[in-house]
From Swiss-Prot:
InterPro entries for this protein: Acetalactate_synth_ssu, Acetolactate_synth/TF_NikR_C, Acetolactate_synth_ssu_C, ACT-like_dom_sf, ACT_dom, AHAS_ACT, AHAS_small-like_ACT
GO molecular function list: acetolactate synthase activity; acetolactate synthase regulator activity
EC number(s) stated in the UniProt entry for this protein: 2.2.1.6
Residue ranges occupied by any ACT domain in the UniProt entry: 10-84
Protein known as: Probable acetolactate synthase small subunit
Length: 168
């Protein structure tokens, strides 16, 4: 789970959607000694432009350095520190759970429905579940499933954007 501690920042960046950009951004953090807690990258609303969501720790001075350095990269179009209270954050989790009996399957399906997840695959001894939400919701869901035996787990980490009509 990515906990939003006081010195944790959500940085959103619009970048050219082409090979090598992620490597250059990650390299910048490495060279400066900044730790990336999480990074997600995907298409934006504009063709050829990707949105990066970077979760990083540091005080305001560190955040200012990160922002300035990101803005210097040629492939970076825009950078913004997102205010946690004014931000919508979500992540995706897929989890394969041991479920050989009908009663276990039934209980897992009930938990999945309560957490508004979906069963995306079924096999004779396992269910694969997809759930989205904030990190705390996903952590709570996984805690319930641990008793059944988690066979595989994949989490995207948070992606974020500003609430309301404000855009990058």
């Amino acid at each position: 789970m990515i906990e939003m501690e006081p010195d944790t920042h959500i940085i959103s960046a619009l970048v050219e959607h082409k090979p090598g950009v992620l490597q250059r951004v990650a390299g910048l953090f490495t060279r400066r000694g900044f730790n990336i807690e999480n990074i997600t990258v995907g298409e934006s609303e504009t063709p050829g432009i990707a949105r990066m969501t970077i979760i990083a720790r540091g005080d305001d001075r560190v955040l200012e350095q990160i922002t300035k350095q990101l803005n210097k990269l040629i492939d970076v179009i825009k950078v913004r520190d997102l205010e946690p209270a004014a931000t919508v954050k979500r992540e995706l989790c897929m989890v394969k759970v041991h479920a050989p009996s009908e009663s276990e399957r039934s209980e897992i399906i009930q938990y999945t429905n309560i957490f508004r997840g979906r069963i995306v695959d079924v096999s004779p001894d396992a269910l694969t579940v997809e759930v989205t939400g904030d990190s705390e919701k996903i952590d709570a869901f996984l805690e319930l499933l641990r008793n059944f035996g988690i066979k595989e787990l994949a989490r995207t980490g948070p992606t974020a954007m500003s609430r309301g009509s404000r855009t990058m």
